[in-house]
Amino acid sequence: MKKGTRINILTGAAIVPLFLMNLIIGSVDIPVADVFSILCGNGSDKASWEYIVMQARLPQAVTAVLCGSSLAVSGLLLQTAFRNPLAGPSIFGINSGASLGVALVMLAFGGGVTVGTVSLTGFMAVLVAAFIGAGAVMALLLMFAARVRNNVMLLIIGIMVGYIASSAISLLNFFATEEGVHSYMVWGLGNFGGVPMSQIPIFAVITAAGLILSILQIKPLNTLLLGEQYAENLGVNTLHLRNWLLVITGLLTATATAFCGPIAFIGLAVPHIARLMLGTDDHRQLIPGTIIMGAVVALACNIICVLPGNGGIIPLNAVTPVMGAPVILYVIMKGRR
């Protein structure tokens, strides 16, 4: 068995205790025996514990796994496609597009939108708005990508699109009500606990589709590591591959942002953690390793968020930079050497 495979198996095994800890730890500590009993369908003496586990903590843990995996793989695909170790899902403005969509709903329309006979409010309004915002930015980027071959120029375009979206959000914040600004700020802090159990299957199906499409790109991604010219000599259409990777990362990032809010650093840092652990750039090991590591990091971050217990929940985006920034600093210093 190869070293990378062994490490991926061991890292994957770590998901089980971390997932279980997410079900146990919180403002109410639930014994392990009761958690297992509830998961097995035998219930618990306390009905409130059953509700907490099945309707709050279980969807939260599943959301962490899905979001962590999708953002991590998105970062890996972009770092390989653009040969830039600091590329991440947020660099192309997809997060900003989703945020702009949510800002329009929360700040301009008061939390709900009515189109004809269809009325969307609350979570569904935010979800649809985030998808539309991210999709609009994705369409804009693909339009530019069809005309711009230079990867650096496309990166700059993505950054500029993000700045424009951020500027629009700032204007909306300025003219919005205090309640609207507060709601938007809470969403912007990121949260794995906002997805109801009824929405988990939708989240899981879209994420699984994106991850499968990513795995199918392993061979051309490995060829791309040898250089664009070499890859084209081997029959890889690098422009088509780049645009296809943008579509995959757009799908994964838009989905994660729509369901969980803009999550920082996971997409940027986790691919580097996977590379450091596996010691290889081979995507046959790296993509599965990044998927697993993304889930592990997201679950660990969620545990840290709920550690205060009755003291409240730490915002997710206050935890992810603490875990991700040291990794990025290490990569930068290593690059200088």
Identify the function of each model-found stretch.
Residues 1-337:
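Alpha-helical transmembrane segments in inner-membrane proteins
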